[in-house]
């Protein structure tokens, strides 16, 4: 939609088990090729994640190209919702990077094929705490396999990406007395985390 500045890509990777499902993320990609590659990669991952979880749904993912701070709003989200609706239920979306519950509510105005709505509207609410807890449990399982104990105390753990999921994960790790390092490309997110927690900041280029 050139008028609204909406440029989105929906990747449906697999529908053998059911309709494709995966969140929508908004990102200021360097190129359309980068956006397509990301959508393809993420949709493939959703196929495996949904299958492993024993869900009767396939894998899909959507990306919206652009700076969320500049172009995102009700009109854009509703237009995107109409596009999803045009797929007739082949793809269901939900919240991902730079998207909110409110964005899902806007999309819901145009299509029923959306999850992650607010609790007051019968949804599950913010998925970030649950996502973070899943990562936390996976960390403990890995540590137990390697060290024989699932304690994270005194373990050095780096969290790259300090959005909602990263913030909740850091909170869990700090409670377990882990030594937490953090990295993000956005200074405001680093500032918000360092004001809340005692962590060590690492430059993104130094992570690997």
Question: Which residues make up each language-model segment?
Answer:
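Glycine-rich phosphate/diphosphate-binding loop of Rossmann-like nucleotide-binding domains
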Residues: 126-208
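N-terminal ligand-binding/catalytic initiation module
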Residues: 1-122
């Amino acid at each position: 939609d050139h008028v609204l500045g909406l440029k989105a890509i929906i990747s449906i990777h697999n529908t053998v088990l059911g309709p494709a499902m995966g969140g929508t993320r908004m990102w200021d990609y360097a190129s359309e090729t980068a956006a397509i590659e990301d959508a393809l990669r993420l949709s493939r991952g959703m196929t495996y994640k949904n299958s492993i979880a024993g869900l009767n749904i396939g894998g899909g993912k959507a990306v919206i190209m652009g700076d969320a701070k500049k172009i995102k709003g009700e009109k854009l989200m509703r237009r995107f919702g109409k596009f999803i609706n045009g797929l007739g239920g082949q793809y269901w979306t939900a919240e991902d990077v730079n998207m909110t519950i409110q964005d899902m509510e806007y999309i819901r105005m145009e299509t029923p094929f959306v999850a992650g709505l607010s609790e007051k509207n019968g949804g599950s609410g913010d998925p970030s705490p649950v996502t973070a807890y899943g990562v936390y449990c996976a960390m403990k399982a890995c540590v137990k396999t390697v060290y024989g104990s699932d304690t994270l105390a005194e373990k050095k753990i780096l969290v790259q990406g300090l959005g909602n999921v990263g913030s909740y994960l850091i909170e869990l790790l700090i409670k377990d007395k882990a030594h937490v390092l953090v990295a993000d490309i956005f200074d405001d997110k680093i500032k918000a985390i360092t004001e809340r927690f005692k962590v060590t900041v690492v430059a993104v280029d130094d992570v690997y």
